[in-house]
C-alpha cells in the first residue's frame, strides 16, 4: 500500500551483509565524537544548530527504552522525512535499533496525510510520531483507524495546542497521545 519494502533488523544478518569485509564494518567512532548536527527551530521557534555525539544519541535511545519500553513500538509508522531529526532519530532509528518493525512512507506528499487511518489499519501500526501541522490536514481528510492496533502517538517539533491534542486523541480513539520534546530542545 505504501510501496515500501519492510526492512527489519534481522535483515542485517542476511547473506547481503556477509559479503562485506569485516574490517569495513568496524566503527572507528568514539562515543564522544560528533555524530550529526541538527539544524532546527524546534518547538521553541528559535533557530539553532545542535551537535550530537554518538554518546548523546545512545543516551536518547536508551532513555526512551527505559522510560517507554519497546512493546508499543512493535509496528512503527514513519510519515516524517528521515532527513528531519524527529523522523530519523526517534521515529525511525529507535524502534529499528531495538528490533521492532519500521514502516517508512516512500515519499512525503500531502496525499499521504489524507490516509493515516487507512495506513494504520493496513499495516497494523502500533506507534507513530508526527508534527502538529500534519494533524491539521489529517484530521480534516483522513478517516480514523478502525482497528485497535494503535497504542501510542507522539507529536512534537512545534507547539501543540491542548485543543489539537484532544482532537488527535478523539480521532485515534486512544488516550496515549503525548507532546514530545526532541533532542534539540
Predicted regions and their residues:
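Conserved pre-ATP/AMP-binding loop-to-beta segment of ANL
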Residues: 20-39, 46, 69-75
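Short beta-strand->loop structural element characteristic of the AMP-binding/adenylate-forming
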Residues: 1-11, 48-51, 78, 100-108, ...
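ANL superfamily adenylate-forming
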Residues: 1-32, 153
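Conserved S/T- and glycine-rich ATP-binding loop of Class I adenylate-forming
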Residues: 34, 40-43, 76, 82, ...
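Structural detector for helix-capping/boundary residues
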Residues: 32, 54-55, 123, 175
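Gly/Ser/Thr-rich phosphate-binding loop
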Residues: 125-130, 139-185
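Conserved AMP-binding A3 loop
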Residues: 35-62
Amino acid at each position: 500500500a505504501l510501496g515500501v519494502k519492510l526492512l527489519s533488523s534481522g535483515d542485517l544478518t542476511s547473506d547481503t551483509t556477509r559479503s562485506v569485509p569485516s574490517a569495513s564494518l568496524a566503527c572507528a567512532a568514539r562515543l564522544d565524537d560528533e555524530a550529526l548536527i541538527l539544524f532546527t527551530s524546534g518547538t521553541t521557534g528559535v533557530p539553532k544548530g545542535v551537535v550530537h555525539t554518538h554518546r548523546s544519541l545512545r543516551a536518547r535511545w536508551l532513555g526512551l527504552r527505559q522510560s517507554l519500553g519497546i512493546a508499543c513500538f512493535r509496528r512503527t509508522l514513519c510519515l516524517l522525512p528521515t532527513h528531519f531529526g524527529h523522523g530519523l532519530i526517534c521515529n525511525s532509528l529507535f524502534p529499528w535499533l531495538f528490533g521492532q518493525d519500521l514502516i517508512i512512507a516512500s515519499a512525503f506528499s500531502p496525499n499521504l496525510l489524507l490516509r493515516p487511518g487507512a495506513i494504520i489499519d493496513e499495516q497494523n501500526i502500533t506507534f507513530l510520531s508526527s508534527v502538529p501541522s500534519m494533524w491539521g490536514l489529517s484530521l480534516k481528510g483522513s478517516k480514523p483507524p478502525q482497528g485497535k492496533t494503535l497504542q501510542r502517538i507522539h507529536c512534537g517539533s512545534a507547539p501543540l495546542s491542548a485543543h489539537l491534542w484532544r482532537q488527535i486523541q478523539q480521532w485515534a480513539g486512544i488516550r496515549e497521545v503525548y507532546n514530545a520534546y526532541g533532542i534539540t530542545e
